[in-house]
C-alpha cells in the first residue's frame, strides 16, 4: 500500500555508497505498509477503501534457486539478494514477470529462448512456476547473448545514428509514428539475413562463414552458442 512518495523516501533513507539503489526486499519489507506489517483487518479496510496497492512476490529467505540453462548450464541464485518484484500493478495490469509465466503456461511452451538481460529475473520466474503451476511444467530456458551496438546493447536508435538497419523489415513505432527502415527494404536477401543472424553468437567450430539454410539446420547445435 506504499505511495510513490513513501517508496522514494525509503530509497533516500537507505541509500548508501555501497547500496546506491535500495530494493524492496526482505531487509525492509516489514518496515513498509503491506500485509506483513499490517493486520488482516487493516489490509482489508484499505482494500475496501480502494486504496491503490500492488501485489508483490515475497521472496523466500536464504534459499538457493537453481535451474539448467541450455546455453549456460547450471544457474543458481541466492534469494536473499533478490527483491520482491511487483506482479500486479496498482491499475490491475500484470508486470512482465507474471504475464510471461502465465502466458507460457497457457500456450504450453516447452522451450523459451530470450536475451541474457532477463537472466537476473530467472529466479523470480522459477519460483512463480513452482508456486503457480509446478516447477516440473516449467519450459527449458536458453538465455542468448545480446546483439551489441557500438556502445552496448543494440537499440533501434543505433540504426538511425550509425546508418545500419536493426529490424528485419521496416518497423513503425505505434506511439511516436517513427519509422525505422529494415534489412528487406535495404535489399538484403532473406538467406543472407538468416546467415548473418546465425553467425552472431554461434559458429560450428570451422572457418565457414556462408551457410545455406539446410546447412544451418544440419550443423546448428545449442551447445555452440556463445555464453
At which residue positions do the language-model features occur?
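Active-site cores that bind ATP or allylic diphosphates and position pyrophosphate for catalysis
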Residues: 2-161, 165-166, 179, 204
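Catalytic adenosine-cofactor/nucleotide-binding cores of aminoacyl-tRNA synthetases and other
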Residues: 133-227
Amino acid at each position: 500500500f506504499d505511495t510513490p512518495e513513501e517508496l522514494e523516501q525509503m530509497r533516500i533513507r537507505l541509500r548508501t555508497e555501497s547500496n546506491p539503489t535500495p530494493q524492496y526486499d526482505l531487509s525492509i519489507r516489514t518496515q513498509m505498509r503491506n500485509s506483513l506489517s499490517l493486520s488482516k483487518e487493516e489490509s482489508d479496510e484499505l482494500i475496501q477503501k480502494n486504496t491503490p496497492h500492488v501485489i508483490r512476490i515475497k521472496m523466500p529467505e536464504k534459499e538457493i534457486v537453481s535451474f539448467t540453462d541450455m546455453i549456460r548450464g547450471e544457474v543458481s541464485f541466492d534469494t536473499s539478494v533478490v527483491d520482491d518484484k511487483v506482479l500486479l500493478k496498482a491499475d490491475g495490469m500484470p508486470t512482465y514477470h507474471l504475464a510471461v509465466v502465465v502466458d507460457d503456461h497457457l500456450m504450453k511452451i516447452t522451450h523459451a529462448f530470450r536475451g541474457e538481460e532477463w537472466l537476473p529475473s530467472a529466479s523470480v520466474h522459477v519460483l512463480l512456476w513452482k508456486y503457480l503451476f509446478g516447477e516440473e511444467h516449467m519450459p527449458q530456458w536458453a538465455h542468448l547473448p545480446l546483439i551489441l551496438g557500438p556502445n552496448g546493447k543494440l537499440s533501434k536508435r543505433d540504426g538511425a545514428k550509425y546508418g545500419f538497419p536493426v529490424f528485419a523489415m521496416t518497423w513503425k513505432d505505434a506511439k511516436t509514428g517513427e519509422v525505422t527502415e529494415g534489412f528487406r527494404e535495404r535489399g538484403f536477401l532473406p538467406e543472407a539475413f538468416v546467415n548473418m543472424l546465425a553467425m552472431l553468437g554461434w559458429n560450428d567450430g570451422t572457418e565457414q562463414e556462408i551457410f545455406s539454410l539446410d546447412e544451418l539446420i544440419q550443423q546448428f547445435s545449442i551447445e555452440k552458442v556463445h555464453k
